[in-house]
Each structure stands twice: as C-alpha cells, then as structure tokens.
C-alpha cells in the first residue's frame, strides 16, 4: 500500500487528507481493522518510536498511552504491586500473572487515567492476549504494534463493533535520515532525531551527591526517551520504570514542572489508604471513579462531598482528605526521577520537584543560572546529570 486516504485532517473541514511515502515506496504499516484518522496516525507513529526506544534502552517490553501527540503515560514491563493493581483498576483481573507487555500498558494507562481516556496505544512487542484484554475494557481510539497474536485480534475485534483501530507496523522499517514538514506552504527539512539515550548521556554528574543506582539510571533514560517524543516545553517525572507525571506543551518551564508534579502527586495520593477505601457504589464505572477521585484529592473536593452530591457516587459520605493529611502522605514519596527537555532557567523548578519526592534529575544544563540550580539540588541531596543535549519536539 503506497498511500492511505483519510476521512479528513486535524479537523473535519480539512479535506482532502492522506498519508503516503514521498519516495513512492510502500507504507510501513497495515491497517488490520478500523479507519484511523490523521491525529491517530500522528499519535501512532510518535508512540511507536517511543516504545521502540524504551525497549532498546532497557531490554524490557514497553507501552505508551498517547493523546494529542504527547504521551499521557509510558512504562516498561515491570510487575505490578497490589496497590498499583487497585489504582489502575485491574485488581479484578489475573494481574499477578500478566505478561510483561500487559504490565507495561497497565502502568502506562494507569499513571494519568484522566488524560489517557480515549488514548492511542503503542506497544513495543507483539500484542498478546493479556494486553488485548486490558485494551478491550478501556476507552481507547486504537493501537499500533509490530504484530498481534490471533487471540489478541479476536479480543480487539469485540471493540467498537469490529471497528477499533488496529495498526501493524513493520519493526524493521528505517525512515530516511532527513525529514520534512510543511507549514504555510513552506517546507522545513531537518535530520531525524536519532540521539541514543544511553548511560553515556547521563554520565556527567554535576552535584555533590553522585550515587546513581541502576534503577535511577534506568528511570533517567526512560524520562529522556519520553521527553524525546513529547511536545515542548516538557518535563517528566518517573518512578519504578514508569512515567508518573508528564508536563507537555507549556511555554514556561516551571509551569511544566508544576503540571507534571501535580500529576505525580495525584498518582501517589491515589495510593493513600483513605483514597483506596473510598466507598464507591457498585454502579459507578471506572471512568466515573477516576473523575471522582480527581476531584476528591483536589481543592474542589466539596463538588463530590456536598450533601446531594456524594450520594450520587458513594454508599456513605467520605471524610474530607485534608491538606495536612495529603502533605503527610506526599512526604512519603521518594526516589523520583525528573527529566527536562531543556535546561532549568531558575532553581524554582528544583524546589517544586523536591515537593514531589524527586531525588534524581536529568537536564541538558547550559543556563546562566546553572550554579543556582546545582546549589538547590545539593541542598536536598539530589543527584543531577547534565546531558548536554536539548530534546525539543514539535
């Protein structure tokens, strides 16, 4: 297949639309079901590169959950804990025997479930039965993978009356070294972003604390790979092999750090016993529970706790989750890694990161205020690596 006609471009009025290879060669994909759209393919191709890089860097199966050309979550296939199974709403499944790929998607989807609603999924490995079962129960636009078992295809065929978007990509496809983009009739050309995210990239430790564990190295590389395919400005908080907060597309770096930090905080607050024990009605769906929890742990908690409101969601009225209780729980979050796609211009980013348990930082360096940023890291005993490489993505 040399080209594929699409229903429309970014918006319904943008017609005609298609994807094709400029050199006239065959597309490196097969659409196995559904009719993916323009934005679906943007998510699919960016997501595929991300999980391909994660697999190459870690040796582990990887998954990502994309929305509007940025990852809402991404992870490698480490086993789930009982608590994670609960907050990711998979504790009613045989989660202890999930395949590594299924664990990766459960983590990628579960980190920021509000943002992942209606995601496009990318998988580094052949989609298996376990992963397909997870995908089947979530609201999602589609999935791209290098292959699918027949069991997985049969399961995915049950989504959207057989119209769920399933794309198979050739894992051996290598794009041309130059890429092109057209804006307002003007063609832009640049070399592809083929930077290898490896141990050498994070070897320049500039802080007093230079103790970088193997797990921290892994998480640093994961954060940088995620940023490589996230709309800039971007920062990413990572813990235990998965993104727990991605801040994308903000003009101010500290607002990126705050946004991603709040997402990381929410991920951790969802694990507090007070939240785990919320008395939901049996009729409340997973998506409705996600929405209720998001409000409950935020500042607008009375929107779900006011008389006449809580009865719609809970069997009994929950107690308020006070600021003091939340801070006490957040103080237990430790050993988080923070990556940034460009340098931190001020130390306020580090101050904010500290509140979300950050111990390890990877950023390019190069700010005139690098000394102040390093000093703040030293104040909190953090380990910071200067990569020397910017990772803007647009």
Model feature map: region roles:
Residues 1-201, 216-234:
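Active-site loops and adjacent core secondary-structure elements that bind or stabilize anionic groups
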Residues 23-35, 111-117, 191-210, 288-309, ...:
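Gly-rich Lys/Arg/Thr-decorated short loops/hinges at beta-loop-alpha junctions or inter-strand turns
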Residues 53, 229, 266-270, 355, ...:
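Conserved helix-loop functional segments at active or binding sites
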Residues 57-65, 166-169, 232-239, 269-280, ...:
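Flexible, glycine/charged-enriched surface loops at secondary-structure junctions
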Residues 70, 127, 239-242, 344, ...:
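Active-site-proximal loop/turn and secondary-structure-junction residues that shape catalytic pockets
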Residues 72-113, 244-346:
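Glycine- and Gly-Pro-enriched alpha-helical subdomains that act as flexible
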Residues 119, 123-124, 137-167, 172-174, ...:
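C-terminal binding/interaction regions
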Residues 126, 205-215, 344:
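Bateman/CBS regulatory modules and CBS-like beta-alpha motifs in cytosolic regions of diverse proteins
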């Amino acid at each position: 297949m040399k080209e594929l006609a699409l229903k429309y471009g970014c918006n319904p009025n943008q017609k005609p639309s298609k994807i094709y290879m400029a050199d006239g060669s065959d597309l490196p994909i097969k659409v196995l079901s559904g009719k993916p759209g323009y934005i679906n393919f943007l998510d699919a191709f960016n997501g595929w590169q991300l999980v391909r890089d994660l697999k190459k860097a870690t040796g582990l199966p990887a998954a990502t959950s994309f929305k509007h050309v940025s990852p809402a979550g991404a992870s490698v296939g480490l086993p789930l804990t009982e608590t994670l199974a609960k907050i990711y709403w998979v504790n009613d499944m045989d989660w202890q025997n999930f395949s590594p790929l299924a664990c990766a998607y459960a983590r990628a989807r579960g980190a920021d479930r509000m943002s992942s609603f209606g995601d496009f999924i990318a998988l580094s490995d052949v989609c298996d039965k376990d992963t397909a079962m997870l995908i089947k129960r979530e609201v999602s636009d589609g999935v791209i993978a290098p292959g699918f078992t027949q069991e997985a295809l049969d399961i995915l065929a049950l989504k959207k009356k057989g119209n769920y978007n399933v794309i198979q990509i050739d894992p051996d496809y290598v794009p041309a070294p130059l890429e092109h983009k057209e804006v307002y009739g003007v063609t832009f050309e640049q070399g592809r972003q083929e930077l290898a995210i490896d141990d050498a990239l994070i070897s320049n430790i500039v802080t007093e604390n230079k103790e970088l564990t193997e797990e921290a190295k892994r998480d640093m590389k994961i954060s940088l790979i995620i940023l490589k395919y996230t709309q800039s400005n971007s920062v990413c908080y990572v813990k235990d092999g998965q993104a727990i907060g991605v801040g994308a597309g903000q003009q101010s770096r500290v607002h990126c750090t705050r946004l991603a930090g709040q997402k990381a905080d929410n991920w951790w607050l969802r694990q507090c016993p007070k939240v785990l024990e919320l008395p939901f009605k049996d009729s409340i769906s997973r998506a409705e529970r996600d929405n209720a929890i998001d409000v409950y742990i935020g500042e607008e908690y009375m929107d779900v706790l006011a008389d006449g409101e809580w009865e719609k969601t809970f069997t009994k009225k929950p107690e308020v989750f006070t600021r003091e209780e939340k801070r006490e729980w957040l103080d237990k979050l430790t050993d988080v890694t923070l990556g940034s796609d460009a340098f931190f211009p001020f130390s306020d980013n580090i101050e904010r990161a500290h509140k979300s348990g950050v111990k390890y930082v990877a950023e390019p360096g190069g700010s005139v205020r690098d000394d102040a940023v390093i000093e703040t890291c030293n104040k909190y005993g953090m380990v910071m690596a200067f990569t020397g490489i910017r990772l803007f993505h647009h």
